[in-house]
Amino acid sequence: MINIDYIMDLLDWNNSIEKQAEGIKLARNVKSINVFLQPCDKCHNKNVWDNCAKVLCEKADDELSPYLVELLEWLQDLNWPGAFRILDRLKSFQGGSAYNIAFNTCLRLAQALKDDVWESNLCMIGGEL
């Protein structure tokens, strides 16, 4: 079994394309995909987000469904690495009620926080109110 920190180290955008590709290849086999949801620690933060988004975007809808709120939260700022990848993946999500619940939760949160940017970004993918 390969250590998740080793995989995250490979996903760092400061690495060569080859090392990043190896990290993505290894990350595909990680069962607990929550580790790729915008990690924020001393060594692994925005420097791995784009590659984490690549890994997440390859996952099936049923694998992503438990993490829809976190994926929608990634859209708070489209300047964040990986945000456009997540946006495009969510546009193709076929989750029905699970998606609508997560979307409405995040939309209401954005409205409560008066976060017009996030609200606008959420509207790019649409959902039900």
Please place each PLM-identified region on the residue numbering:
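Amphipathic alpha-helical scaffolding segments comprising HEAT/armadillo-like alpha-solenoid repeats
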Residues: 1-10, 30-41, 61-74, 96-108
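Alpha-helical scaffold segments
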Residues: 2-6, 15, 33-45, 51, ...
